[in-house]
Amino acid sequence: AIGPSTLSLLGLVRHMAEVERAWFRRRLAGQADLGYVYCSDEFPDGDFDLTAPAGAEADFLAFDAECRLADAAAAGRSLDDTFRSRSGTPMDLRWIYLHMIEEYARHNGHADVLREQIDGVTGD
């Protein structure tokens, strides 16, 4: 049997707010001490913990804000602009964009599975 999961559509939105912040602001823009949106060192999966959510509207606004701030962090930069990963490995903006495509593709797939469980409709 599969155990319970905290995966939810709202959790995915919250998670992507964290991901946008982590790669564009904390890594690319060098704001390493910028805190988390929902997570913490104590609760690394806080983005999926909906026991005390701020509310869906606030979560969607937070996601939108992080996307706008990510756009601002990347504005005017070359795809070859480099930064250091947490481990100190040099990386570039091109890598972030490719990674974000992977992140969104993966989590859109998760969202599709959740939607299918609700409405039973499958794709072509």
Predicted regions, residues:
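Acidic/histidine-rich alpha-helical segments that form the ligand environment
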Residues: P44-R84, R94-M100
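Short, contiguous alpha-helical
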Residues: A1-D45, S85-D124
